[in-house]
Curated annotation (Swiss-Prot):
Demethylates proteins that have been reversibly carboxymethylated. Demethylates the phosphatase PP2A catalytic subunit. Transmembrane segments: none annotated. InterPro entries: AB_hydrolase_1, AB_hydrolase_fold, PPase_methylesterase_euk. Its EC number is 3.1.1.89. One of its GO terms (cellular component) is mitochondrial small ribosomal subunit. Disulfide bonds: none annotated. It comes from Candida glabrata (strain ATCC 2001 / BCRC 20586 / JCM 3761 / NBRC 0622 / NRRL Y-65 / CBS 138) (Yeast). Belongs to the AB hydrolase superfamily. One of its GO terms (molecular function) is protein C-terminal methylesterase activity. Keywords: Hydrolase, Serine esterase. It comes from the Eukaryota. The keyword Hydrolase applies. The active site is at residues 194, 222, 348. This is Protein phosphatase methylesterase 1.
Length: 386
């Protein structure tokens, strides 16, 4: 049987027999009946190394339809001198834990995106879990509100640079922001979209032994090594047809929705403005120029599929539409090495297009793979009374 036929059969069976999707009967994501075409893929002790400042203001007069505090409790800038970066972070941390386990969802966006791409998903996760969960999202280097502390230093965007950033931030966040919570109850899941999936995958091996014990899984959204590598060859065309400037934020939102780069208006209202900054003329310009990353592209996805499949933790891959698996992923799926879910009604930005369905899938993934939730009842010594 040829590889193409294997892929089609495998993806068809998974998309048509997905128990999580049954939960959505009677309630669909808005605009979920429109399939459309996908866009190119998005593309030691740390305590004294950080300085923090609250960020409750915006650097422009535009007030978006949705603001970050609708989705997260905190928006904080965290300086990491050793990385020469001030991270713009968004997070929600509960004051206590209800139950045997607290799921901690840590997100990493893809190239050209921002931490607020996960805003609507984070809110849906909170709704599904009655706010008994933790969510962390942030802007990666070269994106959104994250800045280099010393702009004169070399600014590289190799995969290892993103990985080291993510590793450093995660270790700090868990040790400082979650220190009031029982460590044994934390169940961390890394979730990466496109390039973010690659970063999450390669970060796992760098974690401390203690943190690895708390990570119960890694999830990747719409990323397949073979397809992503081929997509890089089309980036020039993508850059040519994608405007970098709009008359205002509303026009930018409208354009992205109309071109199905973000299919759900509710998600676009919070995710798209974070991709732009205002100019003196009143127009808005895109913060991230993907052309800047060109010298580093080839490092982003190399050896991803094999590395993902071989991760010594639970794994989830969610694909949009009819994306094909490559050879390593096909073999891994047939061997039961990871869970595969296909959303036929989503574009490339799964977390934006289908936030409710994605949240349900992540909650199910957590429940099935977290042994803290397993309660074994014994009938030993019990007797039946008549």
């Amino acid at each position: 049987m040829g590889d193409d036929l294997k892929r089609k059969i495998l993806l068809h069976n998974l998309s048509s027999n997905n128990p999580i999707l049954e939960k959505l009967k009677g309630g669909q994501e808005p605009n979920s009946n429109e399939e459309g075409s996908d866009s190119i893929g998005d593309l030691p002790s740390l305590k004294n190394d950080y300085k923090r400042q609250d960020n409750n203001s915006t650097n422009c007069t535009y007030i978006p339809p949705s603001q970050w505090n609708t989705y997260f409790r905190s928006n904080e800038h965290i300086k990491v001198q050793s990385r020469n970066i001030e991270f713009n972070t968004y997070y929600t941390v509960p004051s206590s834990i209800l139950g045997p386990s607290l799921p901690v969802f840590i997100f990493h966006h893809g190239a050209g995106s921002s931490g607020l791409s996960f805003a609507n998903l984070a809110r849906n996760l909170g709704d599904q879990l009655n706010n008994n969960c933790c969510c962390l999202s942030f802007d990666a280097r070269g994106h959104g509100g994250t800045k280099f502390i010393d702009a004169k230093q070399a600014q590289n965007y190799f995969r290892d640079d993103f990985v080291d950033d993510f590793h450093t931030l995660v270790e700090y966040f868990v040790s400082e922001k979650l220190k009031h919570l029982p460590t044994e109850k934390l169940s961390i899941i890394f979730i990466g979209h496109s390039l973010g999936g690659s970063i999450c995958t390669f970060t796992y091996s760098k974690l401390s032994i203690e943190l690895k014990k708390q990570v119960i899984g890694v999830a990747m959204f719409d990323i397949v090594e073979e397809a992503a590598t081929l997509a890089l060859e089309k980036v020039n065309h993508f850059l040519q047809v994608t405007p970098n400037m709009f008359s205002g934020y509303e026009e930018a939102i409208d354009w992205h929705v109309s071109h199905e780069l973000s299919r759900l208006r509710e998600s676009a209202d919070i995710a798209i403005p974070a991709l732009f900054k205002s100019t003196e003329s009143g127009k808005v310009v895109r913060i991230t120029n993907l052309e800047t990353f060109r010298p580093f592209w080839r490092t982003w996805f190399s050896d991803l599929s094999k590395s993902f499949v071989s991760l010594p933790t639970c794994k989830l891959l969610i694909l949009a539409g009819n994306d094909n698996l490559d050879r390593e992923l096909i073999i891994g799926q047939m061997q039961g090495k990871y869970q595969l879910v296909v959303f036929q009604d989503s574009g490339h930005f799964i977390q934006e297009d289908t936030p409710r369905k994605t949240a349900l899938t992540l909650v199910d993934f957590w429940k099935r793979n977290d042994n803290k939730n397993v309660v074994i009842k014994s009938n030993w010594g019990s007797s039946n009374k008549v």
